[in-house]
Swiss-Prot record:
A GO CC term attached to the entry: cytoplasm
Full protein name: Transcriptional regulator MraZ
GO biological process per UniProt: negative regulation of DNA-templated transcription initiation
Places the protein is found: Cytoplasm, Nucleoid
PANTHER family: TRANSCRIPTIONAL REGULATOR MRAZ (PTHR34701:SF1)
Source organism: Gluconacetobacter diazotrophicus (strain ATCC 49037 / DSM 5601 / CCUG 37298 / CIP 103539 / LMG 7603 / PAl5)
Keywords: Cytoplasm, DNA-binding, Repeat, Transcription, Transcription regulation
Amino acid sequence: MSVFLGTHQNRLDAKGRVSIPAGFRTALRAQAAAGEALVILRPSHQYPCIEAWPTAAFAALSQPLDRLDMFSDEHDDMAAALYADAYPVDADREGRIILPDTLKEHAALTDSVAFMGLGRTFQIWEPAAAERRRAEARTRSRQLALPAQGRRQGGADA
């Protein structure tokens, strides 16, 4: 499976277009099925950024909806949260996408954007906000207590 790695900065042109980094385009094309949009863009619920999902990953994200009663408030709320602000987007020949105005406003994008790889997905940020988020993530990740490979409880070697 192709993954999205690194942070890349590109200019947003006057028409609202931005070039997807080449490595990200390659990963998206490797995952896209014929006739599908290249990527699904949606506002993050947690951060002032745009989430970018390969179509198959977005479909997997929506699978929990299948477990809810289709006519319930919970289903309607989840469907609205997932789909109402989601935009399927294709790139032009130069690898550029057009960012919808509502998403640009959500992420406070003006003239430059930062593409931040997250493995299976990526995010699109205002560059200074992306740097702050990366610093915050590094700090918080140091506080996570992940079990070491090959170690027993108490820190003794296996």
